[in-house]
A protein has these predicted regions:
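Short acidic, hydrophobic short linear motifs in intrinsically disordered regions
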Residues: 1-3
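Short amphipathic alpha-helical interaction segments
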Residues: 5-22
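A short, conserved structural fragment
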Residues: 20-31
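A cross-kingdom feature that marks ATP-driven nucleic-acid transaction machinery
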Residues: 30-33, 38-177
Length: 177
């Protein structure tokens, strides 16, 4: 609050509620945390595009996007856009997984490395926490070709799964999806 020069009078909470209601942000509580620790995520597609690729750019080439196809800036944008499209289509993802009828809460999750517990830092794009005591761990990867899970990436996914299990102490079945 102090960084944004807001008074501690509830006005900032009202602004966040308004932004969420209008679809500019979403809030979620990370599994294992209190509601007071909610995370707010900017989800408005144009606003994200503007801050990432337009603001503070000195580009006046009308063919800019055509000329960036295959370049890192374009690939980065495709990855970010794909992740947001997935987050906007959770009902369709649930349908493809065959769990449309299962009550599900969803969120992202992250943790810092913890040497004491022997876990690496991890971030999970999407968790589908299902009423049937299963949690789908979803990683969203954009690829212009068929995405192949390498041995190294498989190891990384298993590390994330282990970090999640250790930090949250969940007893639910964990499915990497």
């Amino acid at each position: 609050l102090s960084a944004g020069k807001f008074e501690d009078n509830g006005a900032f909470s009202e602004i966040l509620k308004d932004l969420e209601w209008c679809g500019f942000i979403r809030s979620y509580t990370m599994m294992g945390y209190r509601t007071k620790s909610d995370i707010f995520q900017l989800i408005d597609h144009y606003t994200l595009f503007y801050f990432r690729f337009i603001k503070n750019q000195d580009i006046n080439d009308e063919a800019f996007w055509t000329n960036t196809i295959g370049q890192p800036i374009h690939t980065t944008w495709c990855g970010l856009a794909f992740e947001r499209v997935c987050l906007c289509h959770i009902p369709q993802i649930k349908a493809k997984l065959g769990i449309s009828g299962v009550l599900t809460n969803y969120c992202a999750w992250r943790t810092e490395a913890d040497d004491e517990l022997g876990i690496y830092g991890a971030q999970i794009d999407l968790l589908l926490d299902r009423k049937d005591n299963i949690i789908n761990i979803c990683e969203m990867k954009y690829s212009s070709d068929e995405y192949v899970i390498t041995k190294d990436y498989d190891t990384e996914l298993r590390r994330k799964k282990n970090a999640f299990k250790v930090k949250t102490k969940t007893r639910k079945a964990l499915h990497i999806t």
